[in-house]
A protein has these predicted regions:
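Short beta-strand-centered segment that lines the nucleotide-binding/catalytic pocket of NTP-utilizing
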Residues: 29-42, 113-118
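C-terminal lobe/tail of nucleotide-utilizing enzymes
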Residues: 206-289
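Conserved nucleotide-binding/hydrolysis micro-motifs of P-loop NTPases
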Residues: 36-38, 171, 193-195, 221-225, ...
Length: 289
């Protein structure tokens, strides 16, 4: 079984739209949305939830007022100022360090585990999909990414599937690190802007750190051809191949608004031909088909 992850380094490069297009081309695969902080693959996939589970991680202090003597030690020890003068814990400010629980002489502080979000196993018109939703201001998205990927692999094994297509999170932080470990290949989708090039460079270094084969695809290349050439030159210096250049096309946005892949909306145009060519090249290099 192979896993391909599509990442970008920054948001807005067209990563998810390209990933959805691959989903309509690939066969015998499971889908995984690892962008748990701001998941949007479901907007195109329109998944039908089969199983829903809570994601629990971290702890938040809660003061039992029946036991609390208001000695003030917890407020004194808390470095996050999460405990008010009325001895109530602000769940947003609380970092879950547990120092108040440890030092409370009356053992009046509970420390329950947090329910941070949900993860789902769903059916889509392109195959099974594992995705998640992280709650507002919740952390530990890296753990949720690892969980989603683990469940996607388990699901693919149960169904005898050969491929996992993963829509990765933007950036280079903890969620991206969690999404890169153990994958077979990375496709980096970038755009010809200063921030696009800069963030692509950072994510290229991250993929290199994990020793994961990576390729680059430049979306909307014709909006700034000079920058597209700079990106291609950088990729060459790093020994990476630029699979192709995708021209700017409003079809991407129009299909997304309709909740469709570009092949469902208008697959006969030049954009569809380019993406099909990219997918064939990826398939050959990964030895998928």
């Amino acid at each position: 079984m192979k896993e391909l992850i599509v990442i970008s380094g920054k948001g807005g490069t067209g990563k998810t739209s390209l990933m959805a297009a691959f989903a309509s081309l690939a066969e015998n695969k499971a889908l995984c949305d690892a962008d748990v902080d701001a998941a949007d693959l479901h907007l195109i996939m329109n998944p039908k939830v089969v199983r829903r589970s809570d994601f629990q991680s971290g702890n938040t202090a809660a003061i039992n007022n029946d036991l609390c003597t208001e000695c003030g030690l917890c407020r004194e020890m808390c470095r996050w100022d999460a405990i008010s003068a009325a001895y109530e814990v602000n769940s947003i400010d609380c970092e879950g360090c547990g120092v108040c629980v440890y030092f409370c002489p009356e053992k009046a502080i509970n420390f329950p585990i947090n329910t941070c979000g949900e993860w789902f196993i769903s059916d889509t018109r392109f195959g099974p999909m594992v995705h998640a939703h992280l709650g507002i201001a919740e952390e530990n998205s890296g753990k949720l990414v690892a969980l989603v990927r683990k469940e996607a692999r388990k699901l693919a094994e149960q169904k005898g599937l050969d491929l996992i297509l993963t829509d990765g999170p933007p950036g280079v932080g903890c969620p991206v690190i969690a999404s890169l470990s153990g994958v077979d290949a990375v496709l980096i989708v970038t755009e010809p802007t200063v921030s696009g090039k800069h963030d692509m460079q950072r994510v290229v270094d991250l993929a290199d750190h994990f020793k994961v084969p990576a390729w680059v695809c430049v979306n909307k290349f014709d909006l700034n051809r000079a920058m597209a050439l700079e990106i291609e030159a950088f990729a060459g210096e790093k020994g990476l191949g630029v699979l192709d250049h995708i021209p700017f096309d409003p079809v991407f946005t129009k299909s997304m608004v309709q909740g469709q892949t570009i092949f469902e909306f208008d697959g006969k145009g030049p954009l569809g031909s380019t993406i099909t060519r990219i997918w064939r090249t990826l398939s050959e290099r990964m030895g998928i088909y």
